[in-house]
Design a protein with these regions (language model features):
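Aromatic/basic-lined ligand-recognition segments
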Residues: 409-410
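Compositionally biased regions
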Residues: 30, 37, 286, 432-435, ...
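Extracellular/periplasmic, surface-exposed regions of secreted and cell-surface proteins
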Residues: 189-190, 323, 379-387, 394-398, ...
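Short, small/polar-rich motifs associated with maturation and membrane association
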Residues: 1-376, 390
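Acidic, glycine-rich flexible loop segments
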Residues: 290-314, 328-330, 415-449
Length: 738
């Protein structure tokens, strides 16, 4: 059963304090003397109540209400009035009041209404029937999965999007994703992500709570992405957050969930004695070596005679838990008046990884993974007049992470490479030295093998990240100049900071060099430091790193939309500029601002919704090319035909309710080149010289036999470097059955 109200449950949410709100009556003359109160309930086709349905008296814009948490409403009407019942995603109904005093209204879902308006480039809305580009819309409800990262919900849900999760470690467990694969040989491969009109990172996307998302669109082909120029070469994801609502009483939503994380597959490990038997059997049958383990070792290990001389260590069970419990809570409030509307959301997420907190057994600190994430979203819209609106969007993200110095991947690898019988986790202390005698192995194939527990507990990291994004959006309708003309401007500022404090200490490892059995059956052991160095008391040292960046973005555009009979026209011209600065530059080039500027345009036409055509273009500048190549032009064109709008299609509309054919062709560009560490190389057309002060050296001579110190060319100047250009051809059809 598909519920329209959020579930009041551990994995659900609920609305509080939302009641039927009757809009104040401004024009009292609209109420006739026979007015009386009518009550009702609005439900979906499964009988579930629908919250927030608009009940409006037709022809009386000042008289209306919305349904409460139980789908109930009441409103003063006269017998001649007609009620208009509407809600996003459902077919609008009109009901004559007459002598009725109580109503039960069932709304039917309408897939065409759900997808009627598609968010296209730069957040402009366009009717789906007139879209000729390859654009997929995603319902926010489809993104509500028990995961702390939004990108983990992409896999298997979004056509044309490839998503895979590289790690399950909290703080690093977001998915990498591509739109229609990788479209460049040298540059960035991830898609452009736009949040409320501003470019953000995949980490910013992952931090979003699904509850704040109003719309989610994926732009795939050149026609859909051309206006973003080089930034959109790998596809574009456009996310818009919720706005406020004109309502006397606020609508409050709460969602609390707990989820359990477990590995998809845990390797099955044999006991130590069985490992030794299998090892001996393998070297015997393959004749690759001598039998390493004696029968006495195998028997003593099986019988647990002494766990230090004949260890039997379950390394995986010693380091990892079977599962982890994570908690998430979300609170939002929505409301406003005709002049000011608001939406606010606060989220808290607590994640713990699969690692055990073993360091507290040996030291005075914790080393397991513990992540606290705090998010805040506040959207305010000021409707200054019928034609002027100012919107303020504020997004804040705070991450507080504690984790071991050694990554989970490296620890897992150490567990896989350490057999259970070569050394114990640690030898017992002798009462002389106050440090841990970590086990090690000095002979055989595993000589010098890493002790996984020592790697886990040798220190920890505290990582604090903060992200603040603020947008100011201004919209002015210019109908007084030209009907259908609109001006819109956006200014955005983003600041990201990251502080990493690493605390680490040395590891003293020991190996078993001898033992003897006492008459009472106990054993005396002789252990020696592993390696040639003398052990010293480990001291916890501290190292700190600071990083981050900030970005300023501005865009403005004119948009024109008009209809003349069966002819529909739409056009847009846009200018934008973007500046990126590092908060902790490491060299001269990194300290220079990275600026981008571009122009974009779009023109579309359709005749009676049947024959469609759209032309887009982006014109972008780049710092990476010399004069004459700095600017790149990337156009696209698309055509479409709504076959189902033709008269000859009527006989089969009961079977195929909608059919549209479309095709597009365009160019996309890339101006980036990555180095071996996957960092963008700037000013790639210029020569790069490493000076003698940087310990540079070069070889010379007829046989390259002489090495001298001095300046070295690491890159030669090339004024002919230019854009990487790719062609995109898209042919498809959209069909809806029944």
């Amino acid at each position: 059963m598909r519920k329209k109200a959020l579930l009041v449950a551990l994995l659900g949410g609920y609305f509080l304090g939302a009641q039927a709100v009757e809009v104040p009556i401004i024009n009292e003359s609209a109420i006739v003397q026979q007015a009386s109160k009518i009550q009702g309930t609005v439900v979906d086709e499964t009988g579930e109540p629908i919250i927030g349905v608009t009940i409006q008296v037709k022809g009386k814009p000042n008289l209306g209400t919305i349904t409460d948490v139980d789908g109930n409403f009441s409103i003063n009407v006269s017998p001649k009035d007609v009620l208009v019942i509407s809600f996003i995603g459902f077919v609008t109904q009109e009901i004559k009041v007459g002598n009725q005093t109580s109503l039960r209204i069932t709304l039917k879902e309408d897939s065409e209404v759900l997808d009627e308006v598609v968010v296209t480039a730069f957040g402009t809305g366009q009717k789906k029937e007139s879209v000729v580009g390859s654009i997929q819309t995603v319902r926010p409800s489809d993104l509500k999965v028990p995961s702390s990262n939004l990108s983990n919900s992409f896999a298997g849900r979004l056509s044309g999007v490839i998503a895979y999760q590289r790690s399950g470690q909290p703080g690093s467990n977001g998915s990498d994703f591509y739109i229609r694969g990788i479209s460049t040989l040298s540059g960035m491969t991830s898609p452009l992500i736009i949040l409320d009109g501003v470019e953000v990172s995949s980490a910013d996307l992952n931090a979003l709570d699904p509850e704040i998302i109003e719309g989610f669109s994926i732009l795939k082909d050149a026609t859909a992405t051309a206006m973003y120029g080089t930034r959109g070469a790998n596809g574009v994801m456009i996310v818009t957050t919720k706005s406020g609502a004109d309502s006397e009483k606020p609508i409050i939503g709460v969602r609390v969930e707990t989820n359990i994380t477990t590995p998809t597959q845990i390797p099955s490990f044999v006991d130590g004695y069985r490992y030794m038997e299998l090892y001996n059997e393998a070297v015997t049958s393959e004749q690759t070596g001598n039998i390493l383990y004696t029968q006495e070792q195998i028997n003593n290990t099986r019988n647990g005679v002494n766990p230090y001389i004949w260890p039997n260590v379950d390394w995986y069970g010693s380091l990892f838990n079977d599962m982890a419990f994570n908690q998430k809570a979300n609170f939002n409030i929505r409301g406003g008046t005709k002049k000011i509307t608001y939406f606010m959301n606060v989220g808290v997420n607590h994640e713990t990884g699969m690692l055990k907190n073993e360091a507290s057994k040996y030291f005075s600190y914790k080393n397991n993974i513990d992540l606290m994430k705090y998010t805040f979203q506040n959207n305010i819209d000021f409707h200054m007049s019928k034609s002027s609106t100012i919107s303020l969007h504020l997004n804040v993200q705070l991450n507080d992470l504690t984790q071991p110095n050694t990554s989970v991947g490296d620890l897992y690898g150490a567990v896989m490479n350490s057999n259970p019988v070569d050394f114990p986790i640690a030898y017992p202390a002798d009462g002389v030295n106050n440090w841990v005698y970590w086990g090690a192995y000095a002979g055989g194939n595993d000589q010098g093998a890493v002790n996984p527990m020592a790697s886990l507990t040798n220190g920890y990291q505290d990582i604090f990240e903060s992200t603040v994004m603020a947008n100011i959006d201004f919209e002015q309708k210019l109908d007084f100049l030209l009907k259908g003309l609109r001006f819109k401007a956006l200014f955005s500022y983003k600041n990201y900071n990251k502080t990493t404090t690493m605390r680490s200490q040395g590891i003293n490892r020991y190996t078993l060099t001898g033992y003897e059995q006492n008459p009472d059956g106990t054993y005396n052991m002789t252990i020696s430091p592993f390696g040639s160095s003398n052990p010293t008391k480990p001291v916890l040292s501290t190292t700190s790193y600071v990083g981050g960046d900030r970005r300023i973005y501005f865009q403005s555009y004119l948009d024109y939309n008009q209809k003349f009979g069966n002819h529909n026209f739409n056009g847009m011209v846009l200018w934008n500029i973007d500046q990126y600065d590092s908060n902790a530059p490491t060299d001269l080039v990194a300290s220079l601002p990275r600026r981008k500027m571009g122009f974009a345009g779009r023109a579309s036409y359709d005749y009676a919704g049947r024959y469609l055509m759209e032309v887009n273009a982006g014109y972008n500048g780049s710092e990476n090319f010399a004069k004459g190549h700095k600017w790149g032009f990337f156009p696209s064109v698309a055509v479409g035909w709504n076959v189902s709008q033709e008269a000859f299609f009527e006989p089969i509309k009961d079977i195929i309710s909608s059919l549209k054919l479309r095709a597009s062709y365009g160019l996309v560009g890339n101006d980036q080149l990555l180095d071996s560490s996957n960092q963008i190389i700037r000013f790639i057309y210029m020569s790069d010289i490493t000076l003698q002060s940087d310990n540079a050296s070069f070889t010379t001579g007829d046989k390259q036999q002489t090495t001298l110190n001095g300046p070295v060319y690491t890159r030669y100047q090339n004024n002919d470097l230019t854009w990487e250009v790719g062609e995109k051809l898209n042919v498809g059809f959209d069909m809806q059955l029944f």
